[in-house]
């Protein structure tokens, strides 16, 4: 029991808040909106914090223009990257003790609700770049985990995992950054779980398979909370005792840099390792010119002229 209390379990939840996808979803199906998705995320966050007093939580919104740390907020200890990580509660909490609710849960709900409201209110869609910055959100999650890990005491063990709640489609433009983040998480023994709401994500399938996490495409979006509590609330030690969804077939095809399409056979630049579906004498990524080796030219043998006597 003492060993479990000394162990720090950090859960970082990344929520896809793409306003274009959620706007289309609200027009198509009013039963499942962003607010209901955030309610399910808050229940999962509260359950994680309530399971052990040493559990830690962070929530990141993956938007089209930024990746914002929703919780801990700006007033929280862990929200400030240069603050005291041991203080996760704000100095004042007027509503935390009125209804007898655990103060940490109340603070988490209030901070997440205020931050997500501020983020969606200030959203200004410009240009054609409307993809979710998922690679940047994963990088921010790894930086946050590293920052908390440095503040952990020497006699305390820390386990970290990342849960991605994905809504919009993958962005092939983020392929290289995404793969770099995946291998960085694997090196740090950080699990990446994925809960996909809409179409399957090949990038997240690879992330879960490489890091040892779970990948689940939700069959019914209004039942999101049930899947979050059933599949993603248990940590990596508890999962071995549960019957979880079976592993899926992972699509390991790479995306070419010229058309951003998945290919099985392609051409790889020997300098920057960019992948192309068609041969090009000059790499469009690093502008390296390749020397094309031509087959050797065989000199024709001179015919011996017969000398007539």
From Swiss-Prot:
Asked if the Swiss-Prot or TrEMBL record annotates the protein with the keyword Chloroplast, the reply is no
Extract one GO molecular function annotation from the record. RNA polymerase II general transcription initiation factor activity
**UniProt-listed InterPro entries:** TFIIH_Tfb4/GTF2H3, vWFA_dom_sf
Give the ZnF (C4-type) ranges. Answer: 269-286
Question: Where is this chain's protein located in or outside the cell?
Answer: Nucleus
Alphabetical UniProt keywords:
DNA damage, DNA repair, Metal-binding, Nucleus, Transcription, Transcription regulation, Zinc, Zinc-finger
Record's superkingdom? Eukaryota
Q: Per the annotation, which location comes first and is thus the protein's main one?
A: nucleus
Pfam families the record matches: Tfb4
Biological process (GO), any one: transcription by RNA polymerase II
Gene Ontology annotations for the cellular component aspect, listed alphabetically: core TFIIH complex portion of holo TFIIH complex; nucleus; transcription factor TFIID complex; transcription factor TFIIH holo complex; transcription preinitiation complex
Instruction: Give the record's subunit note.
Output: Part of a TFIID-containing RNA polymerase II pre-initiation complex that is composed of TBP and at least GTF2A1, GTF2A2, GTF2E1, GTF2E2, GTF2F1, GTF2H2, GTF2H3, GTF2H4, GTF2H5, GTF2B, TCEA1, ERCC2, ERCC3, TAF1, TAF2, TAF3, TAF4, TAF5, TAF6, TAF7, TAF8, TAF9, TAF10, TAF11, TAF12 and TAF13. Component of the 7-subunit TFIIH core complex composed of XPB/ERCC3, XPD/ERCC2, GTF2H1, GTF2H2, GTF2H3, GTF2H4 and GTF2H5, which is active in NER.
What the record says about family reads: Belongs to the TFB4 family.
Question: Which function does this protein serve?
Answer: Component of the general transcription and DNA repair factor IIH (TFIIH) core complex, which is involved in general and transcription-coupled nucleotide excision repair (NER) of damaged DNA and, when complexed to CAK, in RNA transcription by RNA polymerase II. In NER, TFIIH acts by opening DNA around the lesion to allow the excision of the damaged oligonucleotide and its replacement by a new DNA fragment. In transcription, TFIIH has an essential role in transcription initiation.
Which protein is depicted? General transcription factor IIH subunit 3
Q: Which organism is it from?
A: Mus musculus
Q: What is the lineage of its organism?
A: Eukaryota, Metazoa, Chordata, Craniata, Vertebrata
